[in-house]
UniProtKB/Swiss-Prot annotation:
Subunit structure: Homotetramer.
Function, in words: Major role in the synthesis of nucleoside triphosphates other than ATP. The ATP gamma phosphate is transferred to the NDP beta phosphate via a ping-pong mechanism, using a phosphorylated active-site intermediate.
Enzyme class: transferase
NCBIfam families: PRK00668.1
Family, similarity comment: Belongs to the NDK family.
Leader sequence segment: none
Lineage: Bacteria, Pseudomonadati, Pseudomonadota, Gammaproteobacteria, Enterobacterales
GO cellular component, one term: cytoplasm
Binding, ATP: K11, F59, R87, T93, R104, N114
Active-site positions on this chain: H117
Name of the encoding gene: ndk
Protein name in the entry: Nucleoside diphosphate kinase
CDD domains for the chain: NDPk_I
Keywords recorded for this protein, A-Z: ATP-binding, Cytoplasm, Kinase, Magnesium, Metal-binding, Nucleotide metabolism, Nucleotide-binding, Phosphoprotein, Transferase
Any Pfam family the entry gives: NDK
Amino acid sequence: MAIERTFSIIKPNAVAKNVIGSIFARFESAGFKIIGTKMLHLTVEQARGFYAEHEGKPFFDGLVEFMTSGPIVVSVLESENAVQRHRDLLGATNPANALAGTLRADYADSFTENGTHGSDSVESANREIAYFFGEGEICPRTR
């Protein structure tokens, strides 16, 4: 199976809970290599651009408001079958449906404030990674 990259966001509510290290530890325990990461505070323009595919949907404005309410941590993760494995670790988007032991079951507050984001396909991962990271900011780990 080929090595893939996926994109992850630790959202403002999870950052505010001070669980960044716990989430990173779970990524690494699950076999992911963290090959790029940074903390930033999204502007409204950045959030609207990142979530452009949802513009016009009823939840869009609330999502932008939430994602700009505090710092986030964006990361590039690498492993075999990274996209699906990361989504499995995150759990269902709606935390009410998330299995026990998933990140959203443990750290989400609501459907919108669900603690984490993960790419839904390799194509999305490539686009999302490029939105936040230049090639020089990603450090493949060979050891």
